Design a protein with these regions (language model features):
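Surface-exposed repetitive/solenoidal architectures
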Residues: 1-335
């Protein structure tokens, strides 16, 4: 009802949102989320509205939601309502329950996004643009126009539990991110079972395959993963997968404060890197080139993992080796 929340859709494609005065207190006995991606979107009575010209509108007779869509995939984001609209479309197919017109989900995953103002999505329930279980890949562009994007993921009673891909973009391939300041804080509870799902965390991209261009990006990143299984955490990118295309970081600065406090862990691994958590083993030719040009990295990395698989690096925590060797080319790097 008007004082609580709506659940619209079906398993795997549901939208859950609250209107105002909503909160959730997680019990100490709960160790896993029932949903494996997303969170509860928190609308309000000011800038995140349930209305035809707001984020979305609700039809009580059919129990359906219409998201305020975009005419095409050239997107300008001027406030957090615009961000929410774009994120909802990236995460939901248009169907009988959740509808929108204009740019499709596929269009949005290849969008050209531009910021026209600073945007803070903290306390909205949004965990980034995309689903954080890594089903889809962003292939478009994001131009910050010197604006700042702030996000906080996993507050005390809104922790992200067992969600695998955590970042502004869950997965990227061929994406270009430029002229952006990003401030992000991740409090993520990863998988606690050996052999379970790895947890990927990166302020820009949790997991990248293929090319990636990051230019003129300033990132202030705090991340505190706590799962006992594998954690790949990077100031900008959590994991770079096997690829044959260049991944470049230019004219950028990262302050990465990364902490792993689970001192009881002796198996599996952690990779905490100032820019990249891990570059995966290369199985194809030509081997990828990871290029750093005019990059400054600062902050503090603390890893209390007590096993032999603890990896820490100022730029990259680990570069995997298999059939070929990835080339890491640093130029004008300060750590």
């Amino acid at each position: 009802n008007k004082n609580r929340c709506q659940i619209v859709g079906n398993r795997g494609n549901a939208l859950i949102y609250s209107l105002s005065g909503w909160s959730f207190t997680r019990t100490s006995s709960k160790v896993i989320d029932d949903m494996d991606w997303g969170g509860v979107l928190r609308l309000n009575n000011s800038d995140l509205l349930e209305s035809a010209d707001g984020v979305l509108s609700f039809d009580g007779s059919g129990h359906t939601v219409t998201i305020n869509g975009f005419p095409n995939n050239n997107i300008t984001i001027s406030n957090r309502a615009d961000f929410a609209r774009a994120a909802l479309i990236m995460q939901h197919d248009s169907n009988v329950f959740v509808k929108y017109s204009g740019a499709s989900r596929a269009d949005m995953l290849a969008a050209n996004i531009s910021l026209s103002a600073d945007v803070d999505i903290s306390d909205t329930g949004l965990t980034g643009f995309m689903r954080d279980n890594g089903e889809d890949t962003f292939t478009g562009t994001l131009t910050g126009n010197s604006h700042k994007l702030t996000m906080t993921v996993g507050t005390e009673n809104d922790k992200i539990v067992f969600h695998t891909h955590n970042g502004l973009f869950a997965k990227t391939s061929g994406a270009k991110i430029s002229d952006l300041t990003i401030v992000s804080n991740f409090n993520i509870v990863g998988d606690n079972v050996s052999g379970g799902d790895a947890c990927y965390i990166g302020s820009v991209s949790a997991y990248n395959s293929g090319a990636l261009t990051i230019d003129k990006v300033t990132a202030d990143v705090t991340a505190s993963p706590s799962g006992a299984y594998t954690n790949f955490v990077g100031g900008l990118v959590g994991y770079v997968a096997d690829a044959t295309s260049e991944v470049s970081f230019t004219n950028s600065a990262v302050t990465a404060n990364l902490t792993y406090n689970n001192s009881t862990t002796k198996v599996d691994c952690t990779c905490l890197g100032g820019v990249i958590g891990m570059v995966g083993a290369v199985t194809s030719k030509p081997a990828p080139v990871i290029k750093f040009d005019n990059v400054t990295v600062g902050g503090k990395i603390t890893d209390k993992h007590t096993g032999s698989n603890s990896r820490v690096g100022g730029l990259i925590a680990e570069v995997g080796a298999k059939d070929n060797s990835a080339s890491v080319v640093p130029n004008k790097v300060s750590i």
